[in-house]
Structures are given as C-alpha cells and as structure tokens.
Amino acid sequence: MNEQLHNRTMAFAGILQAIAQVQHLARHGESDTDELAASLNTILVTDPESAADVYQDKAALHKGYQLVLNQLGDSSQKDVEITRYLVGILALERKLTRSNSGLAMLAERINQVNRQLHHFAITDEQVIANLASIYSDIISNLGPKIQISGNPLCLQRPLVQHKIRALLLAAMRSAVLWRQLGGKRRHLVFARKAIIDTAKKSLTL
C-alpha cells in the first residue's frame, strides 16, 4: 500500500469521523464518549512523527474508513449533509493555513488546553467548552459559518453546542493534516478509486 496515500486517507477518515459525530449530536443531542474522546484527542497532537500518532483509537478510525467508503463509493450510503459539512471544513482550512496570526493563536490556545488536561479528562465539560471557544474565536471568523442542521431542541443546549464546535475543531485538525500530506479536493473526484481501495485495505489492518 502506498504509504503517503494511506496516511492521507487516514486523515480524511478523521475528518469524516468528526463530522459524522456533529451530525449525530445535532439530531439526537448525545454522543459516544469514546468516539468523542478519539476525535478531540487528535486536536492535541500538534507535532506527530506520523499520521498514526494522531489517530490512536483504531475502532474510531475504522468508523472513519467506513464513512470514506460511504461518501466516495457508488452506494446509497452517500450523505449530502456530511458532504456539505466537509466542503465547509475544507474551505475554512484553506483560510486558516493562509493566516499566520490565526495559526499562532490556535497553537497557543491548544497549548493552554493541553495544560488543563493535567487536571481534567478530554471529555470534561470545561475542556470541551474551551475547545469550542477556540473554534468560535479563531476558526469561525475565517469565512462563512457552517450551518448545522438538526433537532432545534438539541441544538439549543449549551453542552451540545460546545461539543459540536469542539468536533468541528477536530475535523479542522484532520483537514490541516490531510492538506499537509498532499490532500487536494480534486483527489476526491479524480483519485476516488485509489482512496476507496486504500480505505478498504485499511479496514483489514
């Protein structure tokens, strides 16, 4: 298996895994603690030696690979809403990587959260609120806001709002890595078969 394509597909799976949780939260108001932790932990790995260092929860990653197959494959599983969120994240990522001040501020704020983890778990409400505020303060202002669809009663709850923003930050982290590994939007069209084949093989690892 081509290692660069494998790593890139891993990062793309990370984006989709975070986005799918956003969708589920918006509709149902609840999240799987392990999946949430897996996505949020990726935000804090800022100097990885490999993509595998970022995605250490293999069960969560496998869900991401399945989402890659659903979204890029010729199946009825393709989800237009997931695609819309993906397009929004990739557009914001382009703006973030062009903003030196935004990147510097992001690094500093993530360091603050890392220090907080000496005392709290990654899924603690205060930590989630801080990750959400990073998204609101730095990412959200870069371009058009991503409009989240779902159950209005769920979306009104502050903890749900915080989790959604924290997960969008996790999706952004994976999008940055995907781009650093050479990912381009045109690959999702012209290299679709190679990405699907890589995701299928990765599911067996």
From Swiss-Prot:
It is found in: Cytoplasm; Cell inner membrane. The gene is hflD. The keyword Cytoplasm applies. This is High frequency lysogenization protein HflD homolog. Pfam families: DUF489 (PF04356). It comes from Shewanella sp. (strain ANA-3). Its main location: cytoplasm. SUPFAM superfamilies: YcfC-like. HAMAP family: HflD_protein. Keywords: Cell inner membrane, Cell membrane, Cytoplasm, Membrane. Belongs to the HflD family. One of its GO terms (cellular component) is cytoplasm. It is a peripheral membrane protein. The keyword Cell membrane applies.
